[in-house]
Amino acid sequence: MSNLASFCARYSQQTMQLPGGAEFSYRYYRNPVARATVVLLPGGIGLPDLFYLHFERFAEHYSVITFDYQEQFTTNAELARAVASLLDGLDKHVWLVGQSLGGVIAQIVAKFHPERIEGLVLSNTCSLARDMGQEARDELMSMVENQRTWKRRLQLIPMPVFRRLMAWAVMRKTR
């Protein structure tokens, strides 16, 4: 098992230019004997390197892709389109593994780009199903409103500072 620094050295960031000119940065390990590719989608802070232990474990058997939620994609729909473009560029059909907000992104990508998706693994997220009951819908809307409140508060902290603080706090717990 490695630490984050050796992980980052082993699996360096790559960049792809998407149609329309946006650049998309990601980490990708192509396992030559893999039968499937896994895309790891982190939660709301969008720090994929927090999944580095998962990435390494999956890389033993699968090809693995992960990326942060880059600021040029301002809505979940834009990010989902960018993910689909990335997968088109890599010519990959994938399993999406989404945690929290990553689960929402996974569902959006799967809904609008099913031709690229082999399956979903969702954790600690909500359902985007149409047949959701009123109680579940009310709870989801309450969570969204709570996130909006936190987002307004967090906008006072510059995103690079916030991300470093979150990474530091999480990595402290994994030592």
List each language-model region with its residue ranges.
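Conserved acidic catalytic loop of the alpha/beta-hydrolase fold
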Residues: A77-V94
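Conserved HGGG/HGGXW glycine-rich cap/lid loop of the alpha/beta-hydrolase fold
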Residues: L18-F73
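Conserved alpha/beta-hydrolase catalytic His-Asp/Glu region
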Residues: D131-G133, T149-R175
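Flexible "cap/lid" loop of the alpha/beta hydrolase fold
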Residues: K111, G119-W150
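N-terminal cap/lid segment of alpha/beta-hydrolase-fold proteins
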Residues: S2-E23
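Short beta-strand immediately N-terminal to the catalytic nucleophile in serine-hydrolase-like folds
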Residues: L96-G98, S123
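Active-site signature of alpha/beta-hydrolase-fold catalytic machinery across serine-
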Residues: L53, I108-F112
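Gly/Ala-rich beta-loop-alpha elbow adjacent to hydrolase catalytic centers
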Residues: G98-G102, A106
